[in-house]
Amino acid sequence: MFASKLAVCSALALLAVAHAAPGGNDIQKITKAPNVPTKAEGDAASKASAPAIPPKPVNERFPHAVLFGGTCGGTIISPTWILTAGHCTLFTGGRYILAGTNNTDNPNAVTRHVKRQVIHPLFSVGPYWLDADDFNIKQVAARWDFLLAELSEPLPLDGKLMAAAKLDDQPSLPVGLNVGFGGYGTDHFGGTMRSEMHGMELAVQSDEVCSTLEQYNSKDMLCVKGRPPRFDSACNGDSGSGLVDETGRVIGVASWVENDAHSCFNGALVVFSRVASVRDWIKKVTNI
């Protein structure tokens, strides 16, 4: 996700029961058959009185998500490989990743250095260096926005705090598919990265809807939109984050957002680079 001016180096553009008391008279003469709750009513009562299960921390919902280079997200696809966005190399060297945590200040987080980066051979990006107002630019898009980063040593994957996402290989996805991502991007346009990982809930949109964005190309892109009631989106610093379905399969890499040269807003269309379109390239580079 890109901002309107080059000076925004620190944040990449892209690309949140009461149980009923008995009556006052506990001893009553029964003059008619008591009301026996139905099974459905009994189940409902049991659920109402059961203690609420607290939601999982965001990093346990997205154990494959990492902080890449301090200004982007990324996805663990093996103990030694991270998948992120090619444009994340424009403003940062991407020399390290942070994994296994919900907070960048956590001393128990796992850090690994990046020893090699491989950018997709067809990667290209729009004119992010131009003033968006002067040139009437709505959003800056990227094509084939993929980067593979090889780590200096393996991550200790445990399946709970750190896990490798499965790679999508499906040529098409059902419209309305529930998907999401975890990242550290800013909560407003031009802001700074957040220390707490946030989780976003979205749904896959049709190519017809996505094509309202003139730079959209279904060959290497897919787009999503936030689900109600929050209508989540993405903002500066969410670039590179992995879009996953409910089975933990990574289907996209966060690339750019509707009107991202000017603003971040709930309900915006978010464009991800389509992982299935580069499945063979990933295998060639990583043997995964």
Curated annotation (Swiss-Prot):
InterPro entries given in the database record: CLIP_Serine_Protease, Peptidase_S1_PA, Peptidase_S1_PA_chymotrypsin, Peptidase_S1A, Trypsin_dom, TRYPSIN_HIS
Any one Pfam family match given in the protein's UniProt record, by short name: Trypsin
Gene Ontology terms for molecular function: serine-type endopeptidase activity
GO biological process: proteolysis
SMART domains linked to this entry: Tryp_SPc
Active-site residues (renumbered): 87, 145, 239
Domain of life where this protein originates: Eukaryota
Keyword Hydrolase set for record: yes
Disulfide bonds: 72-88, 210-223, 235-264
The enzyme's E.C. designation: 3.4.21.-
Signal peptide: 1-20
Ranges for domain Peptidase S1: 21-287
Keyword Iron on entry: no
SUPFAM superfamilies for the chain: Trypsin-like serine proteases
Region (Disordered): 27-56
Keywords annotated in UniProt: Disulfide bond, Hydrolase, Protease, Serine protease, Signal
Family, similarity comment: Belongs to the peptidase S1 family.
UniProt-listed PANTHER family: PEPTIDASE S1 DOMAIN-CONTAINING PROTEIN, PTHR24260
Protein name: Scolexin B
Lineage: Eukaryota, Metazoa, Ecdysozoa, Arthropoda, Hexapoda
